[in-house]
Amino acid sequence: MVKDTLFSTPIAKLGDFIFDENVAEVFPDMIQRSVPGYSNIITAIGMLAERFVTADSNVYDLGCSRGAATLSARRNIHQPNVKIIGIDNSQPMVERCCQHIAAYHSEIPVEILCNDIRHVEIKNASMVILNFTLQFLPPEDRVALLIKIYEGLNPNGVLVLSEKFRFEDTKVNHLLIDLHHQFKRANGYSELEVSQKRTALENVMRTDSIETHKVRLKNIGFSQVELWFQCFNFGSMIAVK
């Protein structure tokens, strides 16, 4: 695993965070050291796949990055005639994802596409995964994507939505942000790295509150919506059609 040192030295002109070749190379290390509970979420995605994925259906991993969630789901699917479709708009991520998937043998076919998830059809889905992806979409595009997912899910299908959350209570929000930064420092990131990455993400990652997510999903039509995992200001929800 290549260590993430992308923000370890001062960057004179700090642009917006992008999922380019440099990020793709260090992504597994970056996300493990940056997202509290990430490994637990990936493991649980497999458990949810075992429970919710049905025969003769599709599984979608929207914003699949290097394929961790895709592989976790695939390892735990025991139903026949299931196909997994992973989609990411970063070509470097897609290339590494394909290599990662190919390294593990399975009878379950996986198709990895380089595309914008807003332009991909969702159909005959028993499970859709949005693992820290929705937060990078423009806020005005989120409802349309979630409606498309809902319409493409079969009855009793599940959406797994993992996100960084914002909290309405200012003190709580600041506390959880501080704890997250402390978590990153405990994982070896310097103050400079924490500060520069936060600045790079400011314009590209816009977070919602847990309540905003819940209300939006219920308004779209999901019958059951619940937060099943949270660590600091990161967490994951399930929404069942």
Swiss-Prot record:
InterPro entries: CmoA (IPR005271), Methyltransf_25 (IPR041698), SAM-dependent_MTases_sf (IPR029063). S-adenosyl-L-methionine binds at residues 38, 63-65, 88-89, 116-117, 131, 198. One of its GO terms (biological process) is tRNA wobble uridine modification. Signal peptide: none annotated. Keywords: S-adenosyl-L-methionine, Transferase. One of its GO terms (molecular function) is S-adenosyl-L-methionine binding. Pfam families: Methyltransf_25. It catalyses: prephenate + S-adenosyl-L-methionine = carboxy-S-adenosyl-L-methionine + 3-phenylpyruvate + H2O. Its EC number is 2.1.3.-. The keyword Cell division does not apply. Catalyzes the conversion of S-adenosyl-L-methionine (SAM) to carboxy-S-adenosyl-L-methionine (Cx-SAM). Homodimer. NCBIfam families: carboxy-S-adenosyl-L-methionine synthase CmoA, PRK15451.1. Belongs to the class I-like SAM-binding methyltransferase superfamily. Cx-SAM synthase family. This is Carboxy-S-adenosyl-L-methionine synthase. It comes from Haemophilus influenzae (strain PittEE). The gene is cmoA.
